[in-house]
Amino acid sequence: MSFAEKITGLLARPNQDPAGGPEAPWYLKYGSRVLGIVAAFFAILFGLWNVLSIIGLSVSCLVAGIIQMLAGFVVMALEAPCCFVCIEQVGSVADKVDAKPMYFRAGLYCAMAVPPIFMCFGLASLFGSGLIFATGAVYGMMALGKKASATDMRAAAQQSGYGGNATTSTTNDRAGIVNNAQPFSFTGAVGTDSNV
């Protein structure tokens, strides 16, 4: 396999789901891939900024920066394995993750993004890891699939009794009142209590 064929093969598979899962629109497929690449770049950049916070003797920010940089490298390896052509195993790992369902990738990205935010709360960790979390949220939406058509949703609502068109309608006008509750009486004057 030539170098050009290898690059073409790495770039030609934006989130193909071989298991035949829910079909996502093209803009979500390519948008999630682009968002993942941008998120990985900023996570690495801001992770380096957090690592440089060792000057202020903040060990938790140092560890959070290292975790954020590792998360950025993992996301970059899974979203754009063409960036790691020199490492042979990256392509096979990316293929294995692409074979998994979308919710696996969504959970992985969200789980990797949370620890740096809690360890060192700041703009660098919030923005860098927040973009990775947003990528995981987009993959989660893709895993849920498309919404049903309006006619399908109406039919499901009528079958379940929701939506106001229930099959068992009542003619009693007090059907919504709680049992043993008395209605308000407006016939007499309000009695006063003189024992106050």
From Swiss-Prot:
Transmembrane segments: 35-55, 70-92, 113-133
Statement: the UniProt record of this protein carries the keyword Methyltransferase: no
GO molecular function: calcium channel activity; identical protein binding
GO BP terms: bulk synaptic vesicle endocytosis; cell competition in a multicellular organism; clathrin-dependent synaptic vesicle endocytosis; photoreceptor cell differentiation; positive regulation of neuron apoptotic process; positive regulation of presynaptic cytosolic calcium concentration; synaptic vesicle endocytosis
SMART domains in the record: Cg6151-P
Activity regulation comment: Channel activity is inhibited by La(3+), which reduces Ca(2+) influx and thus inhibits it's function in promoting activity-dependent bulk endocytosis (ADBE) in response to high stimuli.
Site (Calcium ion selectivity): E79
Keyword GTP-binding carried by entry: no
Main localization category: membrane
A GO term from the CC aspect: synaptic vesicle membrane
Assembly, per entry: Homomultimer. Associates with the dally/ magu complex.
Role, per record: Transmembrane protein which mediates synaptic endocytosis, fitness-based cell culling, neuronal culling, morphogen gradient scaling, and calcium transport. Regulates synaptic endocytosis and hence couples exo- with endocytosis. Controls two major modes of synaptic vesicle (SV) endocytosis in the synaptic boutons of neuromuscular junctions (NMJs); Ca(2+) channel-independent Clathrin-mediated endocytosis (CME) in response to mild stimulation, and Ca(2+) channel-dependent activity-dependent bulk endocytosis (ADBE) in response to strong stimulation.
Protein name as it appears in the record: Calcium channel flower
Organism of provenance: Drosophila grimshawi
Gene name tied to this protein: flower
